[in-house]
A protein has these predicted regions:
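ATP-dependent adenylation/nucleotidyltransferase module used to activate substrates
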Residues: 1-143, 149, 179-187
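Conserved active-site and cofactor/substrate-binding residues in soluble primary-metabolism enzymes
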Residues: 7, 113, 176, 203, ...
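Catalytic subdomain that performs nucleotidyl-dependent activation
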Residues: 58, 137-217
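Residue-level detector of flexible, active-site-proximal loop/helix-junction positions
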Residues: 65-67, 93-95, 160, 176, ...
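Alpha-helix boundary/capping detector
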Residues: 71, 105, 144, 148, ...
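Short, basic, helix/turn surface patches
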Residues: 111-123, 159-165, 212, 216-231
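The feature marks non-catalytic terminal segments
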Residues: 190-250
Length: 250
């Protein structure tokens, strides 16, 4: 087994245990887009069942945004061949998000609709958790997107509860790099399906990703340092909040 593959398994387990992501008898929806992260997450969460002293159930769920139905068909074949329980939700969310009637950011609307569909399906299936494939790079990129474009210090949570704790979104790859995930997918021969979204390469995330790639070329330790900084905030050395524009002080 390659060192990178062992490291992915180790960090997956560390993230699950440290953040308390999976418990005995959990029933978990694994959101599968067909990309490297969600495909490997589904594979490793099932593989992990052979090595841990707890039991949990997995249901792969693909929300088809309506761009290219072939992706849903390829995923359905993969789920059947590999023996995964699965659900395919066919929608027009992507088309609606990019349609003339939508005045919002298409990515924002599409993501909101897909998440709503996942919540609904989780309830139908009796699942209390939804596992997403976001990796450490995604979490760092979100951190910088919020700083650069949202004027706030915020990122993704490894575990985030909704509806009073009825359903939790979990991100088991919180400690795992995108590079190691891609390498392990290739080592295992897992299919990686291309995105059919027309906005995939035109987002703020792609701009931040290019910036991060430049930083990592100069110093590979930057990724880990930034991730740890997100939970090591020294408020003593941050400026006080500025007054909101248009509001007078006391």
């Amino acid at each position: 087994m390659a060192f990178g593959d062992r490291e992915v398994r180790r960090l997956l387990g560390k993230g699950i245990n440290h953040y308390g992501l999976i418990e005995n008898r959990d029933r978990i929806v694994v959101a599968v887009s067909g990309g490297k992260d969600s495909m490997l997450l589904l594979w490793l969460l099932r593989e992990r069942l052979r090595r841990v002293p707890i039991n949990y159930e997995l249901v792969a769920v693909h929300v088809d945004p309506g761009f290219d139905t072939r992706i849903a068909l390829e995923l359905e074949t993969f789920f059947k061949d590999e023996g995964f329980a699965y659900e395919i939700i066919r929608t027009d969310y992507g088309l609606r998000a990019h349609g003339p009637e939508n005045r919002e950011n298409p990515c924002f609307l599409c993501a909101r609709l897909r998440r709503s569909a996942l919540f609904k399906k989780a309830r139908e299936l009796g699942c209390s958790k939804i596992a997403l494939g976001h990796n450490q790079d995604d979490m760092i990129e979100t951190f910088f997107i919020n700083i650069c474009y949202g004027a706030q210090v915020a990122a993704m949570m490894p575990k985030q509860e909704f509806f009073g704790g009825e359903i939790a979104i979990i991100r088991p790859f919180a400690l795992v790099s995108a590079r190691n995930i891609l390498k392990m997918c290739e080592d295992l021969g897992l299919p990686i399906l291309p995105t059919s979204c027309p906005s995939a390469s035109k987002t703020k995330r792609s701009e931040i990703r290019a910036m991060m790639e430049d930083l990592l070329r100069k110093n590979p330790k930057v990724r880990g340092n930034i991730y740890h900084a997100m939970s090591n905030v020294n408020l003593e050395y941050l400026p006080p909040t500025l007054p909101v524009r248009g509001k007078r002080g006391p």
